[in-house]
């Protein structure tokens, strides 16, 4: 059973090349994990893929994506959109 955090962590490690130990709830994608603006766009796209299904596309609007600066912000956002631990 994977939590929302564990899934976000997995995507962050894969997309950003971050060390697993560095992907903590308080981590900033830019400051702590070294993501530039392109990395952050690619991360959002990967999160949309991770949390969507073939039947239900999951989309994070640009206006929301701009606010997702930390791992905690992403986890909270996903949970607010009905994503649950699996």
From Swiss-Prot:
UniProt entry tagged with the keyword Phosphoprotein: yes
GO biological process entries: lipid A biosynthetic process
Residues the record lists as O-(pantetheine 4'-phosphoryl)serine modifications: 37
A Pfam family annotated for this UniProt entry: PP-binding
Main localization (coarse): cytoplasm
Pathway entry: Lipid metabolism; fatty acid biosynthesis
UniProt keywords, alphabetically: Cytoplasm, Fatty acid biosynthesis, Fatty acid metabolism, Lipid biosynthesis, Lipid metabolism, Phosphopantetheine, Phosphoprotein
Carrier domain mapped to chain residues: 2-82
PTM per Swiss-Prot/TrEMBL: 4'-phosphopantetheine is transferred from CoA to a specific serine of apo-ACP by AcpS. This modification is essential for activity because fatty acids are bound in thioester linkage to the sulfhydryl of the prosthetic group.
Localization, UniProt: Cytoplasm
Keyword Transmembrane: no
GO MF: acyl binding; acyl carrier activity
Function: Carrier of the growing fatty acid chain in fatty acid biosynthesis.
HAMAP family: Acyl_carrier
Protein name: Acyl carrier protein
Species the sequence originates in: Dehalococcoides mccartyi (strain ATCC BAA-2100 / JCM 16839 / KCTC 5957 / BAV1)
